[in-house]
Swiss-Prot record:
GO terms for cellular component: cytoplasm. This is Retinal-binding protein. Shuttles 11-cis- and all-trans-retinals between rhodopsin and retinochrome and regenerates the photoproducts of both pigments. Also binds weakly to retinol. It comes from the Eukaryota. It comes from Todarodes pacificus (Japanese flying squid). The lineage of its organism: Eukaryota, Metazoa, Spiralia, Lophotrochozoa, Mollusca. Residues 206-316 form the GOLD domain.
Length: 343
């Protein structure tokens, strides 16, 4: 199952609102269209505080926000195609590296940003049309060496690094009235940087950090010894019950998966994935189609020298009641009967 299906991308526009920290500090914005009608997006990456954002939200929120962005692009392209009377496809990105410094070489942040690019590639393979890099800093060769192994060949072929005359080049592909004034066009929404359309990021205040909430205080804590695994069991009594989880290590990485007991053996349901989750909380859920004994597995078998302290929480949720069942309850039940049915 693709991430797009897992996250219910078809309903994100109607049902999902990103956390405040993503809305206020995740750089970028759509400003119009290029000459072919493709969506034009500006990414002022140099002003992105990826560490602050990763400290302030869950990985699933970053994934959902990227999918939401792509779903909005599809809607935009559909409307633009109808407006101009021809098919409009793809995304043109101006990737502005002004203000990029050593903080942007923080490996977890780079990995996460590139992972989100990979989310776009994997789930919307034809979305990215071209990416113009402008204001490349002196450390660009170092950054490129770091990210090159993580980019697909297809993505590499869509990247164009422009020199000091980038404004002239951009205007070959983008009409002036569609390009923000600070990039050589004439568009001004709020100011020459089109701040009403583009989030220009900035340092994330520490009050946004999840560590400042009480969530971590309510989590269970376990220590997974070096070379060891720990199974945390839950009894699932009904079909189609959901189990949800969140976890985070104090340091280092940990393997995590979901298993179901089959006789005396544990059967893998969600494959174990080894991830460094010391930076941000990882979360997920699974619909248990069959009753039985399920277990969250925290796997440290790959580490023969280091124990891992893990904080986690899990919740077992009753099977979904679909809208047809709800309508039947309301139609055929009194208020007291309805309360009894859903309690």
């Amino acid at each position: 199952m693709s991430l797009r299906e897992q996250m219910g991308a078809d309903t994100l526009i109607a049902e999902y609102t990103p956390p405040d920290v993503i809305q206020k500090f995740m750089t970028g914005g759509d400003v119009g269209h290029d000459k072919d009608g493709s969506v034009l997006r500006i990414e002022p990456w140099g002003y992105l505080d990826m560490k602050g954002i990763m400290y302030s939200c869950k990985k699933s929120d970053l994934e959902k926000s990227k999918l939401l962005q792509c779903e909005k692009h599809l809607k935009d392209l559909e409307a633009q195609s109808e407006k101009v009377g021809k098919p409009c496809t793809g995304l043109t990105v101006v990737f502005d590296m002004e203000n990029v410094g050593s903080k942007h070489m923080w490996k977890p942040g780079l990995d996460m940003y590139l992972y989100l690019v990979q989310v776009l590639e994997d789930n919307y393979p034809e979305m990215m049309k071209r990416l113009f890099v402008i204001n490349a800093p002196t450390l660009f060769p170092v950054l490129y060496k770091l990210v090159k192994p993580l980019l697909s060949e297809d993505m590499k072929n869509k990247i164009f690094v422009l020199g000091g005359d980038y404004k002239d080049t951009l205007l070959e592909y983008i009409d002036a009235e569609e390009l923000p004034a600070y990039l050589g066009g004439t568009k001004s929404e709020g100011d020459e940087k089109c701040s009403e359309l583009i989030c220009h990021g900035g340092e994330v205040p520490k009050e946004f950090y999840l560590e400042n909430t009480d969530d971590f205080e309510t989590m269970e804590t376990i220590t997974v010894g070096s070379g060891d695994k720990i199974y945390v069991e839950y009894e699932i009594e009904n079909e189609n019950t959901y189990i949800k989880w969140e976890y985070k290590t104090e340091e280092h990485d940990i393997g995590f998966g979901l298993f179901r007991k089959n006789g005396d053996e544990w059967e893998e349901v969600v494959p174990i994935e080894r991830t460094d989750c010391s930076i941000m909380t990882l979360d997920g859920s699974h619909k248990c189609k069959d009753p039985g004994t399920y277990a969250l597995c925290f796997d440290n078998s790959f580490s023969m020298m280091t124990s891992k302290n893990v904080r986690y929480t899990a919740e077992v949720m009753d099977p979904e009641v679909d809208s047809e069942d709800i309508n039947k309850m309301i139609k055929d039940s009194t208020w007291d009967e309805l309360s009894a049915q859903i309690s």
